[in-house]
C-alpha cells in the first residue's frame, strides 16, 4: 500500500483525509474475518446505496453517506481508479479505467480510526450510440433529438452538420428508448430508422435498442435455505465473484464458503446486537452483474416468518394514497367551499378532512384492506379564493387538492387541526400503520407571506426572450413555474434551501410522521434534497423515515434523485405506463412490459423501494381506459369535463384486478390510489378525484374489492412477495408468468390477457422442483416433470403459493 497523507485546510468538515490506494487488487485486501471494524454504535445505521459510476467521471459526495463527515478518516480506493478530492464540497471524483474495472467493486471508508464501511461500486454500462439525419439536399437549419434519451427535451441534444449529414453520438445505458427527430422545430419519426412502436397515446415513436443484452448469460441468485446462522445462496450460471455485505460490511474469508453452485454464508455474530439487520448479495461474470438479494435478519437468524416483519421494514409497505378533501367528511364544522360563482362544483371543496380519515382508520377500513402505509395529500393552508382558469367549460379552481400552499407549517382549517393530525397518526400507529405526508417544496402560492417578504427567493417568471417560464417541464425543469400564481423557489441557493429544509423537518419533529411523498421532485435542485436528507438523518433518529419522490422522465433522471443522501425511491411512472398499456390494451404485449420491468431493475435494483401505482391524481382512471369509456388518444381532462365517464365494458374490472395483482406481486412498494380497490371510474383531473365511495357498491365492485383484499393479504403474509428474487418464466403477447422465491417461500404469478380460455404452460426453475403449490384464486393447475400448467379464463390471473 502507498499511503498519502493529505491535509485540506480549506475543508470545513474534515481536518484530515487519508487516501489509501491499493497497488494490489481489491480482492487481496480482505477485511478481518472477525469484523473488527464494526462499531457498537455505528456512525451510519442505514444501508448505504451503491455508487453508480457515470460516463467519464463520477462525483461522490461524502455527506450522502456520512451526514457528519467530520468522522471520516481515510478511504481505500482500488488501483483501477484515478481520483481527485474537492475540499470545498467534501467530495471525491472517481475516474475509472473501464478496461480493467469489474462490474462490481468495493471502496472502503474508515471512520473514527478503526470503524470500516464498505461501499459497493457499479461499473457504468453506457455505450456509444450514433444518430444521423440526411437532409437529402433540402435546406435544414437545425436537427434535434427528443425522447427518453433526454427526457423529451430537444434543446438537450442537437445534431451537427458535417457537410453531408447531421450527426451526434450519445452515451446510453442498455435498454429500449423511444424518440423523435425534431427538424426545424417539427417533430417526426426518424426516417432512417424502421423500428417504431405505439406511444400509448394513439401515435408512434421511433425506437432504438441499445446493447446486445444476454440476460441468459448473467448469473442468477436465489436465497435457497437457512439453518441457524448459515444462509445458503444458490447461483445459476457462471459466477466469477460474489459480494456479500452484512449491513455495510463486506464478508470474506471464512464467512463465505463455496460448494459448486451454492454459497454458504455464515452470519457474523455482530448481528446478535441488532433487532433488524440485513444481508445483501450480488454476483457477476464477464457478461455483467446478477440480480441482488436482500435478506432481513432478526439477531443472528434469517427472518422466515412474515409475522416478525414490522411497519418499519420499508420493503413490506403496502401504500394507500388518498386525497383528504375527497375521502371522508368527518365533521361538517370545518366545511367551507370557496364562495365564487366562477368555480364549478367539481373544482371546489367537497368537505373531506383529517377527522374523516381517522374515522375510517377506527372503522377498520384500512385494516380490512391490509394497508400498512397511508399517504395523505398535502394538508397545509391553501388560499381562500379562486385561481387558475380552464376554458371549456369555463371554471376557476379552489385549492382543495392542497398543492397551493400559503403556509408551510399551518394545517388548512378545512382539513382540521394539529390535534386532529396527531390523533390520526396515533390511531394509525396503534394499528401498525405508517403515515406519510405529501410535501410541497417546489413552489408556494403568491399569497404566501414568504413571497412578499423574499420575492428574490424565487426563479424568474420570464425567460430571457420575454416569454413566460410556465409549464416548461423539461426544457427549464429547475426554474419553470407551474402557473403564474405559483412561484418556484430557487432551492439551489443556501439562503433559500436552509430555511425551507428546516420547514420540512418541522413536520417530522413536531408530528410522528413516518415520511414524505415529495411533490415535483425533478423540478427541485439536488442541493435541497441533500440538505433535507442530511438533517433528517442527524435530527430524526428515533424512527425509520421513508422518502419517495415524484418524477416524470427517464429512468436515468429518476435514479439521479435516489440513494444515500437523497431519497429512498420515486414512483416508477415508466412501469405504470407500460402496465396500463399491457393490461388495458390488446395490442401491447406482455413481453414489452417484462422488458420494461427488467430495465427498471437494472436502474433501481431488484429489491427496490419504488412506488408501483394503480393510478394517481394526474391520470385518467385505469378502469375507464380498460373498459373503453376513456380513449387513449383523447384529452382525458377535457373528457372528464364534457361527458360522464363511466367504466365501459365490464371486462375492465378483471383487467383492474390484473393490474393490482401485478403491482402487489413485483418488488417495490405497491400503491393503491383511493377507489382503485373497487374500480372507481373517471377522466383526468378533477374527474379522477371524485368523492370516495364506501357504501352501496355494486356486486362486481364488491367482487373486485374482495380480490384486492386477498391480494394485499397474500403480499403481507408471503415472504417471497416481499423479499423474494424475481425470475421471468414466460412473456409473450398475451401470457405472462414469473416466480419469486425466498428460502422455503415461493410464489408463481400467471396472467392471461387474451379474450379466450388459455392453458398457460411453462417450465419450473430447477431450484423450485419438489415444492408443492396451491392455487390461491381457484384456477386448475398442475406440475408434471417440471412443467407447470395453469388454466386461466380470459383477462384473469392466478397466484400459486408453495405450501
Residue ranges, per PLM feature:
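Active-site-proximal helices and loops of the catalytic beta/alpha 8
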Residues: 44, 49, 58, 503-505, ...
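Loop/helix patches that line or flank the sugar-binding groove of alpha-linked glycan CAZymes
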Residues: 314, 330-349, 601-769, 792, ...
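C-terminal beta-strand-rich structural cap/linker in extracellular carbohydrate-active enzymes
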Residues: 178-179, 784-803
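Substrate-binding/active-site clefts of carbohydrate-active enzymes
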Residues: 313, 317, 325-511, 531-541, ...
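C-terminal motif of bacterial Sec signal peptides marking the signal peptidase cleavage site
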Residues: 27-28
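Aromatic-rich carbohydrate-binding modules that target alpha-glucans
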Residues: 120-174, 184-211, 243-265
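Solvent-exposed, low-complexity, repeat-rich "mucin-like" stalks and linkers
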Residues: 34-79, 220-237
Amino acid at each position: 500500500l502507498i499511503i498519502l497523507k493529505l491535509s485540506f485546510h480549506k475543508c470545513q468538515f474534515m481536518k484530515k483525509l487519508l487516501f489509501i490506494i491499493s497497488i494490489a487488487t481489491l480482492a487481496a485486501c480482505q477485511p478481518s474475518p472477525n469484523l473488527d471494524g464494526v462499531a457498537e454504535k455505528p456512525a451510519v445505521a442505514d444501508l448505504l446505496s451503491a455508487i453508480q459510476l457515470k460516463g467519464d467521471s463520477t462525483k461522490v459526495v461524502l455527506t450522502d453517506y456520512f451526514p457528519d463527515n467530520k468522522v471520516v478518516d481515510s478511504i481505500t480506493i482500488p488501483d483501477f481508479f484515478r481520483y481527485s478530492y474537492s475540499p470545498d464540497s467534501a467530495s471525491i471524483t472517481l475516474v475509472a479505467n473501464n478496461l480493467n474495472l469489474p462490474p462490481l467493486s468495493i471502496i472502503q471508508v474508515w471512520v473514527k480510526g478503526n470503524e470500516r464501511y464498505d461501499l459497493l461500486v457499479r461499473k457504468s454500462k453506457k455505450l456509444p450510440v450514433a444518430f444521423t439525419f440526411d437532409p437529402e439536399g433540402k435546406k435544414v437549419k437545425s436537427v434535434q433529438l427528443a425522447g427518453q434519451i433526454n427526457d423529451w427535451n430537444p434543446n438537450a441534444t442537437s445534431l451537427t452538420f458535417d457537410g453531408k449529414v447531421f450527426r451526434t453520438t450519445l452515451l446510453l445505458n442498455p435498454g429500449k428508448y423511444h424518440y423523435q427527430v425534431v427538424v426545424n422545430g417539427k417533430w417526426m419519426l426518424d426516417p432512417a430508422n424502421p423500428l417504431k412502436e405505439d406511444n400509448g397515446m394513439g401515435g408512434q415513436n421511433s425506437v432504438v435498442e441499445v446493447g446486445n443484452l444476454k440476460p441468459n448469460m448473467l448469473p442468477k441468485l436465489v436465497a435457497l435455505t437457512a439453518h441457524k446462522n448459515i444462509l445458503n445462496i444458490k447461483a445459476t450460471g457462471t459466477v466469477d465473484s460474489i459480494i456479500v455485505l452484512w449491513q455495510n460490511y463486506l464478508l470474506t474469508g471464512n464467512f463465505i464458503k463455496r460448494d459448486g453452485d451454492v454459497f454458504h454464508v455464515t452470519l457474523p455474530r455482530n448481528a446478535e446486537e441488532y433487532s433488524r439487520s440485513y444481508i445483501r448479495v450480488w454476483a457477476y461474470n464477464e457478461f455483467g452483474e446478477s440480480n441482488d438479494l436482500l435478506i432481513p435478519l432478526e439477531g443472528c437468524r434469517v427472518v422466515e416468518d412474515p409475522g416478525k416483519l414490522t411497519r418499519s421494514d420499508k420493503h413490506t409497505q403496502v401504500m394507500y394514497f388518498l386525497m383528504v378533501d375527497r375521502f371522508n367528511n368527518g365533521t361538517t364544522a370545518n366545511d367551507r367551499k370557496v364562495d365564487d360563482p366562477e368555480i364549478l362544483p367539481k373544482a371546489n371543496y367537497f368537505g373531506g378532512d383529517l377527522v374523516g380519515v381517522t374515522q375510517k382508520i377506527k372503522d377498520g377500513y384500512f385494516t380490512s384492506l391490509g394497508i400498512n402505509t397511508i399517504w395523505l395529500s398535502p394538508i397545509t393552508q391553501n388560499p381562500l379564493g379562486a385561481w387558475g382558469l380552464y376554458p371549456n367549460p369555463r371554471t376557476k379552481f379552489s385549492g382543495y387538492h392542497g398543492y397551493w400552499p400559503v403556509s408551510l407549517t399551518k394545517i388548512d382549517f378545512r382539513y382540521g387541526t394539529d390535534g386532529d393530525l396527531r390523533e390520526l397518526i396515533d390511531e394509525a400507529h396503534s394499528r401498525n400503520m405508517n403515515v406519510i405526508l405529501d410535501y410541497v417544496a417546489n413552489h408556494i402560492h403568491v399569497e404566501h407571506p414568504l413571497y412578499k417578504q423574499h420575492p428574490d427567493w424565487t426563479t424568474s417568471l420570464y425567460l430571457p426572450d420575454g416569454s413566460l417560464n410556465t409549464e416548461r417541464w423539461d426544457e427549464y425543469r429547475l426554474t419553470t413555474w407551474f402557473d403564474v400564481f405559483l412561484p418556484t423557489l430557487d432551492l439551489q441557493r443556501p439562503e433559500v434551501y436552509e430555511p425551507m429544509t428546516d420547514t420540512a423537518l418541522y413536520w417530522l419533529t413536531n408530528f410522528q410522521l413516518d415520511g414524505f411523498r415529495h411533490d415535483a421532485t425533478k423540478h427541485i435542485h439536488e442541493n435541497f434534497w441533500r440538505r433535507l436528507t442530511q438533517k433528517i438523518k442527524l435530527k430524526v433518529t428515533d424512527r425509520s423515515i421513508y422518502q419517495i419522490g415524484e418524477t416524470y422522465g427517464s429512468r436515468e433522471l429518476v435514479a439521479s434523485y435516489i440513494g444515500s443522501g437523497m431519497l429512498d425511491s420515486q414512483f416508477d411512472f415508466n412501469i405504470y405506463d407500460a402496465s396500463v398499456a399491457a393490461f388495458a390494451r390488446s395490442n401491447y404485449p406482455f413481453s414489452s412490459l417484462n422488458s420494461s420491468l427488467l430495465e427498471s431493475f437494472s436502474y433501481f435494483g431488484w429489491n427496490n423501494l419504488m412506488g408501483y401505482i394503480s393510478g394517481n391524481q394526474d391520470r385518467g382512471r385505469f378502469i375507464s381506459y380498460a373498459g373503453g369509456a376513456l380513449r387513449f388518444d383523447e384529452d382525458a381532462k377535457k373528457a372528464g369535463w364534457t361527458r360522464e365517464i363511466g367504466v365501459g365494458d365490464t371486462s375492465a374490472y378483471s383487467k383492474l384486478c390484473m393490474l393490482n395483482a401485478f403491482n402487489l406481486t413485483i418488488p417495490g412498494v405497491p400503491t393503491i390510489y383511493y377507489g382503485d380497490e373497487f374500480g372507481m371510474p373517471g377522466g383526468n383531473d378533477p374527474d379522477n378525484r371524485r368523492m370516495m365511495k364506501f357504501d352501496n357498491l355494486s356486486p362486481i365492485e364488491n367482487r373486485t374489492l374482495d380480490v384486492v383484499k386477498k391480494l394485499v393479504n397474500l403480499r403481507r403474509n408471503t415472504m417471497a412477495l416481499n423479499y423474494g428474487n424475481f425470475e421471468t418464466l414466460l412473456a409473450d403477447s398475451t401470457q405472462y408468468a414469473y416466480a419469486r422465491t425466498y428460502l422455503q417461500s415461493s410464489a408463481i404469478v400467471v396472467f392471461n390477457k387474451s379474450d379466450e380460455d388459455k392453458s398457460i404452460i411453462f417450465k419450473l426453475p430447477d431450484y423450485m422442483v419438489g415444492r408443492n403449490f396451491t392455487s390461491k384464486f381457484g384456477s386448475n393447475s398442475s406440475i408434471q416433470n417440471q412443467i407447470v400448467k395453469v388454466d386461466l379464463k380470459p383477462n384473469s390471473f392466478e397466484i400459486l403459493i408453495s405450501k
